[in-house]
Structures are given as structure tokens and as C-alpha cells.
UniProtKB/Swiss-Prot annotation:
Induction: Expressed in the early phase of the viral replicative cycle. It comes from Lactococcus phage p2 (Lactococcus lactis bacteriophage p2). Belongs to the skunalikevirus SaV protein family. InterPro entries: SaV-like. This is SaV protein. It comes from the Viruses. Keywords: Early protein. Involved in the sensitivity of the virus to the host AbiV system.
Amino acid sequence: MNYGTNKHYANEYGMELNEYFKHHFSYEELAGWYTMQVLKYLVRAGKKEGESYDKDRNKALDYAGELANLSNENELTEYTTDDIMGFAQDIADDFKQWKGERNNFKSEFTKEEIKAIDERYLEFIEEV
């Protein structure tokens, strides 16, 4: 992300919103924020009028990089941007199959695949 060059993310004192987040939110809140941003841009990539697939995918990559940096700066499990993108892509793929069911999820994924995604998510959250 080019926060320094994207002045629409700065206040009148030149302070960047992302830096504000880092000073005012907990690690868990930031990790959740970055994760949701990665997912949002992966899911919408190529769908929003006027926005290219590559532009949204690059935004997802930027947020994945922020999440990897956050994890690494906090001396937790070392993640790469690719690790996070892979994890997020699994969730985005899962979302594509979701029809809005509650507690009775049915998709083209097998129960074993869903369990593996759930386990990977839980491991990721515990480590991040």
C-alpha cells in the first residue's frame, strides 16, 4: 500500500490512518481487520465496475503483506504474503460456494475439505 503517496489516507497533520490503527487497536483487532480486507478484495476482484481484477488482487496482496508484517513484528509465527493469500483464497473459495445456510453448510466441498479449511483457519488465528 502506498499510504505515503495516497494522501486520502492522511489527516491534516500528515498522519496516516494505518499508523493510527497500529497505535490504537490491539494485535487481534488489526489481524482481523487485515484478514477481512484481504478477503474483501479477493472476493470482489474483477467484479466491481471500473476496477480491474489486478487492481483488487494487488490490494489484497498489500493487506496480506501488512498482516504478514504485523505477525512478524510481534515475533509470532513467521508468515509470508503467499501463506496469507493461500489461506485467504481457501476462505474466498469457500464463500463462493456458500448459499446462506446457517449451521447446515452444504457446498461442493467434502466434509473433509471443510474440516481441513476450518482447522487451517484455527491454526492460522492461533499463530497470528
